[in-house]
Amino acid sequence: MKLKTLILSAVAAAAFAAPALAQSPAAWEMPKKGDWIITGRVTDVFSEADNAITTAAGADSGLKVDVGDSVMPTLGFTYFLTDHLAVEAILGTTKHEIRAQGGATDVAVHETWVLPPVVTLQYRPLTEGRFSPYVGAGVNYMLFYSGEDKNGFKVDLDDNFGYALQAGADIGIQGPWNLNVDVKKVWVSIDADVNDGALKSDVDLDPWVVSVGVGRKF
């Protein structure tokens, strides 16, 4: 996880928001029923997948899957159903390199863009103060597009649904502005076929989605 990158991005986002904050002298107030928070984030999506790559007959090839990290900007849209319950959807896309590794082999086989929308229902226990922690649960859909095969391999990835858990917090700054820290864990598995099924893998992507950013309440 590129933690240093995320921290530096959060500092940059806060600096970018500073002029707007200077024009918002009012104290930050907890969001209430009917409010929106739109959050711009820097997000690191990383998977620890290391599933085996097998032959069409199911024999172990000696290779495993490796999926690269990706840090990209994302947007979060949160609507408050009540003072304590909110629905969040995230919008963003990330690019990942897929490698086959094992023994002396370490080769890139595919690079793909992923659209991984996540929708969660959040519970927020606090209604006063500047610190608004939350937990949530929801669903995810992994959509792969604009894939590029590498080094003579042909890779097909199946889209699939998954589910997610979430924890995070909004920290009030002033006026409608807040800092946001958010962590999601997504559980999703996909089928990957290599060279028209000559090789295959059931890949447990199960990515972590770690974000920092600045939000505005409407």
What is the role of each PLM region?
Residues 51, 96, 100, 174-218:
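Predominantly the C-terminal beta-signal and adjacent terminal strand-loop region
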Residues 18, 34, 83, 127-133, ...:
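Short coil turns and loop connectors of transmembrane beta-barrels in diderm outer membranes
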Residues 50-57, 99-106, 145-154, 191-198:
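Outer-membrane beta-barrel translocator domains and adjoining extracellular loop/strand segments
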Residues 44-46, 74-149, 207-218:
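Gram-negative (and chloroplast) outer-membrane scaffold detector with strong preference
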Residues 94, 112-119, 124-126, 158-164, ...:
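Contiguous, function-dense segments enriched for cysteine-driven chemistry
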Residues 21-77, 146, 217:
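Short glycine/proline- and aromatic-enriched beta-strand/turn motifs that initiate or cap beta-hairpins
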Residues 1-34:
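Cleavable N-terminal export/targeting peptides
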